């Protein structure tokens, strides 16, 4: 299945919020204000997959980086979904821990993980 990515627009907030609400672990890097606000610098794009309740996110500057999707993470078909949309050599950046745990269970040894300790969430009081 070919995903149709398009640039993030301010009008996308309406459908974006639906995916945000059903995401198991929300990270600030994936919030609409961050993605939309930095879209000019990082070329953020989204592709909706309504039948799977997933919103795929991609960064296009300085090169293409596939990011974790928002939406329904609790599913048992991740291996099939990723292979059909991204192929056998898929590479994802900034995958939240809860999604990574699901992928570890379902993808097993084919998954290579690189911990990026320089990237972390800010905590505010």
What are these regions, as identified by a protein language model?
Residues 1-83:
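N-terminal charged segments
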Residues 70-125:
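Acyl-donor-binding surface of acyltransferase catalytic domains
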